[in-house]
Swiss-Prot record:
Originating gene: yihI
Protein name per its UniProtKB record: Der GTPase-activating protein YihI
Lineage: Bacteria, Pseudomonadati, Pseudomonadota, Gammaproteobacteria, Pasteurellales
Native source species: Mannheimia haemolytica
GO terms, biological process: ribosome biogenesis
Function per UniProt: A GTPase-activating protein (GAP) that modifies Der/EngA GTPase function. May play a role in ribosome biogenesis.
The keyword Lipid metabolism belongs to this UniProt entry's keyword annotation: no
Length: 195
């Protein structure tokens, strides 16, 4: 953007003319005689005129709005009664109108969330169940079990069977024949075959 030369206005160079000045009534002091103003009074008048000339424009900023407009803006707004209530809200449900009738709120049945275990973990827990092991020991010893104990044992054994089939685990034969057969096969094996 190019610079433009500032030009001087005539009012900047030349003082205001007598014809441009508004006429002010001269103070009359001494019984109707027109007297000449003193130097001090003339200076005061000149300062006053200069101040008036200086402040010709409007005041700056939005804060300096007209007081009449501000009064119009101060009109009280109708507030919504729902906002800003000071009334305390009860946190517990109470029967305020009918406390003596003994009404109670029925509890909503919540199903307990069972922790889901992996099949391996569940099988390990069932195999290490002390109660089940005790019942199996009692049964092997020839003791008779109560109906509840028998039912519990059957449920646990059925669940163990399901988990073993799900995991693909087969029952181990507890007979010692397999171990003896392997030992006999090892002893009779010809080592020279593997050379």
């Amino acid at each position: 953007m190019s610079r433009t030369k500032k030009t001087r206005r005539i009012t900047d160079i030349m003082p205001a003319r007598k014809t441009d000045k508004p006429k002010q009534p001269m103070p009359k002091l001494g019984g109707g005689k027109n007297r000449k103003l003193t130097r001090y009074e003339l200076d005061a008048q000149a300062r006053e005129e200069k101040r008036k000339r200086k402040h010709k424009g409007l005041p700056t900023g939005s804060r300096n709005a007209d007081p009449a407009e501000q009064k119009k803006a101060v009109v009280k707004e109708v507030k919504d009664p729902r906002i800003g209530s000071r009334k305390k809200v009860p946190l517990m449900v109470e029967f305020v109108n009918q406390p003596e009738k003994g009404r109670t709120i029925k509890a909503v049945p919540v199903e307990p969330i069972k922790p889901t275990l992996s099949p391996e973990q569940e099988l390990e827990q069932l195999e290490n169940n002390e109660c089940l092991n005790q019942l199996l020991d009692d049964l092997e010893a020839g003791k008779t079990l109560s109906a509840e104990d028998q039912k519990f044992m059957n449920e646990c054994l059925d669940r163990i069977d399901e988990l073993m089939t799900e995991l693909g685990i087969e029952y181990e034969d507890e007979e010692g024949d397999n171990g003896d057969a392997l030992l006999r096969q090892f002893e009779t094996m010809d080592i020279n075959k593997f050379r």
